[in-house]
Every structure is written in structure tokens, then in C-alpha cells.
Amino acid sequence: YNTTRFTMNIAYLISAHTDPAQLRRLVLALHADAEYFVHIDAKSALSQFASALSLPNVHYIGDRVDVRWGTLREVQYQMNLIRAAVTFPRHFDRIFFLSGMDYPLWSNARITRWLEEQGDREILQGFCMDTDLIEAGQKETYTVARPAFRNVRLGILARILLRLTGYRKPMHF
């Protein structure tokens, strides 16, 4: 178990749906005094994650969401994780989003040093979708998202009709 400790309060918000052993390795590899808020996808068997969820400072988020890629359900589980962290009695200086399949490439000492160098600076990553730097395929993936219905054949037909008519959903930022 990693015993690296430092004065900055960190929360890791983790979403997992598979490989409970990897989730356990991830938590054990990161800062020992951090708090870990974990969402397990509703499609996954919770019992398989018992070992990882029983570690110190690991908080299981009981409001499970059946996450579907490209839908608002992704936002819902993230909001549940954020709510759990901001209502926790401890104040956090840094909050990180991770997947249960992630693993740190840096040592905790290097992560700590880098965070301390950042001071109060917020680190966010994003990009504007309205730019020539983004490939056309990425824009199309965004604008022609998952159809509202689940029938695959109807979804394929809908995409073909959308492409033939030239219709594009407006992008809102």
C-alpha cells in the first residue's frame, strides 16, 4: 500500500465498469491520504468490486447509472461523483477524474511536486469544436450522435437519411 503523504487534499473521482483488480491497483498506486469516490456502472456486478471498494478512503457512490457512451448518462454519473466530493466533510484542493482502467505514469512524488508547482492554477483540457484543427469525422461524430431509439437497423437508416438530406444538429457550447 502506498504511504506517500503530503499537505494538499486530493480527491480522485473514478468511474469503473470492468476489471476490479485494476481498480484496486490504481487506488493502491495513488496517494495514500487522498479520498477516492468510485462509480461502478449499473451494468456491472457490484460484488466483483468488493475488494477495491473496501480499501481505506474509498467511497462507493450508491447512485449507480447505466452509462451509455455519447449520452447524457455520462454526464449524470460524473455529476453524482462531483456531488459526493463537494458534499464530503473534507475540502479538496484538487479533484481528478479517472477511469478505473487508468494507471499513473508518474510516481506520487513527481505528481506531488508538479501539483505544488502549479499553485492555485486550474488545469482543464478542452478544445473548440468550431475550428479547422478538428477533423471532419470528429465533427460528424458529434453532430450525428446516437439515435434516440435503440433499434440498430432504424439507427443506420436514420444516419443514412441524415447524410442524404445534409441535416446537421446544431452545436451548442
What residue ranges belong to the model's regions?
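Intrinsic-disorder-associated, low-complexity terminal segments enriched in Asp/Asn/His/Tyr and depleted
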Residues: 1-2
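ER/Golgi luminal nucleotide-sugar-dependent glycosyltransferases, focusing on the catalytic module
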Residues: 5-173
